């Protein structure tokens, strides 16, 4: 999903989760959501001291890779001008694993320039308002309407 390190990223994450809960073509209960699968349920947004804990970091990293490998779709919530390096790595990894990569951009930011590499791995880029009705049973390719940098 998204980074959740800034207010804008956190709002986008919450909006995406709300839209996914409303989408009848996705089984969110059995989907891998990184923030809901932190090692030992330790959330570093609540306990930043664990960012220095190698065990937590390695287990969380490996858990996210397992989540990508065992999922059909990689959905990345992308906030232009606030790119999350971790999301970029996960997008590339998902593509290398043959996963369908869907980027979701908040409506008010849709059309802004996005990173060329994130654009390149995406099979489709949609507005947040389209996520609740996106048909995950019929994924399609489409171009992003905005520019790249």
Swiss-Prot record:
It catalyses: 2-deoxy-D-ribosyl-base(1) + base(2) = 2-deoxy-D-ribosyl-base(2) + base(1). Pfam families: Nuc_deoxyrib_tr. It is an enzyme of class 2 (transferase). The active site is at residue 90. It comes from the Bacteria. Keywords: Nucleotide metabolism, Transferase. Its EC number is 2.4.2.6. One of its GO terms (molecular function) is nucleoside deoxyribosyltransferase activity. InterPro entries: Nucleoside_deoxyribTrfase (IPR007710). GO terms for biological process: nucleotide salvage. Belongs to the nucleoside deoxyribosyltransferase family. Catalyzes the cleavage of the glycosidic bond of 2'-deoxyribonucleosides and the transfer of the deoxyribosyl moiety to an acceptor purine or pyrimidine base. This is Nucleoside deoxyribosyltransferase. It comes from Lactobacillus johnsonii (strain CNCM I-12250 / La1 / NCC 533). The lineage of its organism: Bacteria, Bacillati, Bacillota, Bacilli, Lactobacillales.
């Amino acid at each position: 999903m998204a980074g959740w390190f800034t207010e804008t990223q956190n709002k986008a994450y919450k909006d995406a989760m709300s839209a996914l809960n409303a989408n009848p073509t996705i089984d969110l209960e059995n989907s891998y959501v990184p923030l809901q699968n932190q090692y030992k349920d330790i959330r570093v947004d609540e306990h930043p001291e664990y960012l220095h804990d190698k065990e937590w970091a390695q287990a969380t990293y490996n858990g996210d890779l397992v989540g990508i490998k065992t999922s059909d779709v990689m959905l990345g919530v992308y906030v232009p001008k606030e790119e999350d390096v971790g999301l970029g790595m996960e997008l590339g990894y998902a593509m290398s694993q043959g996963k369908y990569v869907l980027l979701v951009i908040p409506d008010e930011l849709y059309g802004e320039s996005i990173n060329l590499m994130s654009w390149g791995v995406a099979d489709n880029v949609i507005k947040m308002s389209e996520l609740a009705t996106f048909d995950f049973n019929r994924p399609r390719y489409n171009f992003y309407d905005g520019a790249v940098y």
